[in-house]
């Protein structure tokens, strides 16, 4: 997982609320178990509309998604996070997230930032009037900055540390590889092992 400290990019305003994981990536796209190849399924139904925000040329290459309240509700599917990342998003900002989606996002390296709805609406207005507006999401200072605006956000220290170190669950486990090997070496041979034969 790539470490995340500070990211400056352009934002795309998704003025929709109650976006569930099936809208993020429909079930028909869930036939893979790798983390790549999902960009084509991201918001697949909505992208059929030429006027959909991701189809508009002024938002091409934007890597911060600014969504309405209740983003990522519905069924638990890591594929929703993978699709957003595969499309190029590093950050999703919303007033509220589905709990499971937010947990999956943060564990997978996609920063899910909660800002008050009024702050999200103000950010929408700015990026709609000037899509080239740089937006900085600073995990070190826990701030979102754009134009002359600075907004703080909350994130627990442990999750923040994991993101800044670039550690997913596998990365955390691998940090203890020597201790795991030492434990396995001390176990009786007749017990199950995690070591390769």
Curated annotation (Swiss-Prot):
Pfam family, one: Aconitase_C
InterPro entries (UniProt xref): 3-IsopropMal_deHydase_ssu, Aconitase/3IPM_dehydase_swvl, AconitaseA/IPMdHydase_ssu_swvl, IPMI_Swivel, LeuD
Molecular functions (GO terms): 3-isopropylmalate dehydratase activity
CC terms in the record's Gene Ontology section: 3-isopropylmalate dehydratase complex
SUPFAM superfamilies the record matches: LeuD/IlvD-like
GO biological process, one term: L-leucine biosynthetic process
Disulfide bonds: none
Pathway: Amino-acid biosynthesis; L-leucine biosynthesis; L-leucine from 3-methyl-2-oxobutanoate: step 2/4
Keywords assigned by UniProt, alphabetized: Amino-acid biosynthesis, Branched-chain amino acid biosynthesis, Leucine biosynthesis, Lyase
Reactions mediated catalytically: (2R,3S)-3-isopropylmalate = (2S)-2-isopropylmalate
Enzyme class, UniProt record, top EC level: lyase
Statement: the UniProt record of this protein carries the keyword Amino-acid biosynthesis: yes
EC number assigned by the record: 4.2.1.33
Gene3D superfamilies: Aconitase, domain 4
Subunit structure: Heterodimer of LeuC and LeuD.
Function: Catalyzes the isomerization between 2-isopropylmalate and 3-isopropylmalate, via the formation of 2-isopropylmaleate.
Cross-referenced PANTHER family: 3-ISOPROPYLMALATE DEHYDRATASE SMALL SUBUNIT, 3-ISOPROPYLMALATE DEHYDRATASE SMALL SUBUNIT 2-RELATED-RELATED
Cited HAMAP family: LeuD_type1 (MF_01031)
Entries under NCBIfam families matching the protein: leuD, PRK01641.1
Similarity-based family: Belongs to the LeuD family. LeuD type 1 subfamily.
Stated name of the protein: 3-isopropylmalate dehydratase small subunit
Organism (species): Acidothermus cellulolyticus (strain ATCC 43068 / DSM 8971 / 11B)
Chain's gene name: leuD
